[in-house]
């Protein structure tokens, strides 16, 4: 066979990896229509498994890692030593920006990793293509900037300024002012739900739908100001760190936290969740770095940092980056097992780390610090094989427009955010009688309305006729009946006055003419 053809043994081995479970035997089913449908479903599942296995074999790009020889340690390698030993294209992606006039820089990459957005503490905003150096926009707001965030593409971004959150386009034009988001410290964006989330000094977690402009939810955490807000990429649940050492998990449909975790004895400085949603890493003011299992909500192990860590971030391949003081330390395989030595270390002389983010699909770690921005090479951090249907770094303008339209059409509702991301499409296997009983318990009791006969005439034939027919329907017969009731009411009142020997009621002529009417 030709070397280009796929090895059947490799395909079979990979097919077992993507198996969807035990296959059904349709021969035992007597119903012909049901048997035919199950056969089609099984064939479809088999084709999917085979396609996934062949796609994995065709992946030519494999992630590379630093490998030490003998007594060498990978954390001793410096960036100036790595640059000559990597590809020229990768070496050009390592650069440094000296921006010491506008304070510490927070930043954000787009989902495809093409654009970067910088936000200086003193009001400097810059958006550009970091590969080519093409500048999109640059602003000087002359106002405090606490955080910046791209939306689902590079057309719009949000800036948390001194009082409100503002939305700009990629040309620097102010589009919206979100006055419901006051004194925000941290921003986050849920791309599949098109929700912008924020939390600030007031301690309110807010969800804003950027496609409709509607404020979806506003939850009071009750734990004071917070500046730690990160999402779980697996289920879109927001993780909020608080000053009392707790981490709370939130969804828009719940006014109370889904989960409360006491993670540290002091304030939570930052946290990060891996792509699978299984592990969470937290950094506290007690100089501890803890790894948590989100399936059991238990601590796995912890690390000690010489000074409290400022920032945490996890790459697509699971590399953990920790920013503490002037250092940025990268740990490999630090989630499942405790490591004795870090993978890499980078020093920022006479500066301090402000923000950390890995660039999607690249072996690049971005570091925002007090004197600017720096991009360093971290071999093995990026995912080499991307899904072009979801994020395509090389998409044309027309493809990006089609992707945006598809994202709007496939937008998920906020009610679909849950701790269990697989609950959609599941079959409720409870007995029908049990489901009916649960539905009746949840249904509010219906109170039957009974007319009260308080006085004479309240339950007459005309009244019973009006109650029997629809109350909101007005026809000629109803008007005639209501007029008859009004005349009957007046006659009854006059009869009562005559029995009590009271003078008949005269017409009310108003305030000006009432003094001329006899009061006898």
UniProtKB/Swiss-Prot annotation:
Gene Ontology CC terms, in alphabetical order: nucleolus; small-subunit processome; sno(s)RNA-containing ribonucleoprotein complex
rRNA processing is among the record's keywords: yes
GO molecular function, one term: snoRNA binding
Residue ranges, annotated region (Disordered): 1-20
Biological source species: Schizosaccharomyces pombe (strain 972 / ATCC 24843) (Fission yeast)
Repeat positions for WD: 99-140, 142-179, 218-260, 263-302
A biological process from GO: maturation of SSU-rRNA from tricistronic rRNA transcript (SSU-rRNA, 5.8S rRNA, LSU-rRNA)
Cell compartment(s), UniProt: Nucleus, Nucleolus
InterPro entries per the UniProt record, alphabetical: BING4_C_dom (IPR012952), WD40/YVTN_repeat-like_dom_sf (IPR015943), WD40_repeat_CS (IPR019775), WD40_repeat_dom_sf (IPR036322), WD40_rpt (IPR001680), WDR46/Utp7 (IPR040315)
Alphabetic keyword roster: Nucleus, Repeat, Ribonucleoprotein, Ribosome biogenesis, rRNA processing, WD repeat
Domain of life of the source: Eukaryota
Name by which UniProt lists this protein: Probable U3 small nucleolar RNA-associated protein 7
Free-text function comment from the UniProt entry: Involved in nucleolar processing of pre-18S ribosomal RNA.
């Amino acid at each position: 066979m030709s070397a280009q053809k796929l090895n059947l043994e490799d395909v079979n081995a990979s097919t077992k990896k993507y198996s969807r479970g035990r296959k059904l035997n349709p021969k035992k089913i007597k119903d012909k229509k049901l048997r035919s449908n199950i056969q089609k479903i099984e064939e479809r599942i088999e084709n999917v498994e085979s396609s996934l296995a062949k796609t994995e074999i065709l992946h030519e790009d494999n992630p590379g890692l630093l490998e030490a020889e003998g007594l060498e340690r990978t954390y001793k390698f410096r960036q100036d030593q790595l640059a000559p030993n990597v590809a020229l294209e990768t070496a050009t992606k390592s650069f440094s920006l000296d921006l010491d006039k506008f304070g510490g820089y927070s930043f954000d990459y787009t989902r495809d990793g093409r654009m970067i957005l910088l936000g200086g503490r003193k009001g400097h905003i810059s958006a550009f293509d970091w590969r080519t150096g093409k500048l999109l926009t640059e602003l000087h707001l002359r106002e405090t900037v606490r955080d910046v965030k791209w939306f689902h593409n590079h057309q719009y971004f949000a800036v948390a300024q001194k009082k409100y959150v503002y939305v700009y386009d990629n040309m620097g034009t102010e589009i919206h002012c979100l006055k419901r988001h006051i004194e925000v410290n941290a921003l986050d964006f849920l791309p599949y739900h098109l929700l912008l989330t924020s939390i600030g000094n007031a301690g309110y977690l807010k969800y804003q739908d950027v496609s409709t402009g509607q404020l979806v939810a506003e939850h009071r955490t009750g734990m004071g100001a917070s500046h730690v807000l990160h999402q779980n990429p697996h289920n879109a649940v927001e993780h909020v760190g608080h000053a009392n050492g707790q981490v709370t998990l939130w969804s828009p449909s719940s006014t109370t936290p889904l989960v409360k975790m006491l993670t540290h004895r002091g304030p939570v400085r930052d946290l990060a969740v891996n792509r699978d949603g299984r592990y969470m890493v937290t950094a506290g003011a007690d100089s501890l770095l803890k790894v948590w299992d989100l399936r059991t909500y238990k601590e796995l192990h912890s690390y000690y940092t010489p000074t409290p860590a400022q920032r945490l971030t996890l790459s697509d391949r699971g590399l953990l980056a920790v920013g503490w003081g002037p250092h940025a330390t990268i740990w490999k395989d630090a989630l499942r097992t405790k490591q004795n030595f870090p993978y890499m270390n980078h020093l920022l002389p006479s500066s301090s780390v402000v923000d950390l983010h890995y660039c999607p699909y690249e072996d690049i770690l971005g570091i925002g610090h007090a004197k600017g921005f720096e991009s360093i090479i971290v071999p093995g951090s990026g995912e080499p094989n991307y899904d072009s249907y979801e994020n395509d770094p090389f998409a044309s303008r027309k493809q990006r427009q089609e992707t945006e339209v598809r994202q709007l059409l496939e937008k998920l509702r906020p009610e679909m955010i849950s701790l269990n991301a697989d609950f959609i499409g599941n079959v409720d296997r409870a007995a029908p009688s049990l489901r009916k009983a649960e539905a009746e318990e949840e249904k509010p009791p219906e109170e039957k309305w009974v007319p009260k006969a308080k006085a004479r005439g309240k339950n007459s034939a005309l009244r019973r006729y009006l109650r029997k027919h629809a109350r909101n329907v007005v026809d000629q017969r109803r008007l005639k009946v209501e007029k008859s009731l009004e005349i009957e009411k007046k006659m009854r009142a006059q009869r009562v006055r005559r029995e009590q020997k009271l003078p008949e009621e005269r017409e009310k002529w108003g305030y000006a003419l009432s003094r001329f009417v006899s009061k006898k």
